[in-house]
């Protein structure tokens, strides 16, 4: 799997604390290796066909789309805030 970052994801990632950024990096490594890894808690977002969510921690979520072998990262940040604007 390959990763592609949207501008919004990049801006949100840059706003994370160093600790949260490290958690996201670890989650992205797992996502590339095995998108169904249990620690990521990956699930399709309600009301969407193509947007998925995964957890970098209990409080940090990231949203993405999968197109073949490409994962397009859409947003990252605090759980509730990120899921309101996937």
List the predicted regions and their residue ranges.
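Enriched for short, Lys/Arg-rich terminal
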Residues: 2, 7-11, 15-22, 55-86
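A short, surface-exposed loop/turn module that caps and links secondary-structure elements
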Residues: 29-55
């Amino acid at each position: 799997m390959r990763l592609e970052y949207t501008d919004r994801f990049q801006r949100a990632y840059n706003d994370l604390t160093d600790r949260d950024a490290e958690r996201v990096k670890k989650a992205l490594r797992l996502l590339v290796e095995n998108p169904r890894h249990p620690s990521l808690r990956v699930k399709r977002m309600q009301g969407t066909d193509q947007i998925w969510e995964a957890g970098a921690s209990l409080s940090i979520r990231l949203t993405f789309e999968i197109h073949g072998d490409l994962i397009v990262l859409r947003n990252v940040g605090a759980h509730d805030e990120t899921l309101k604007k996937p």
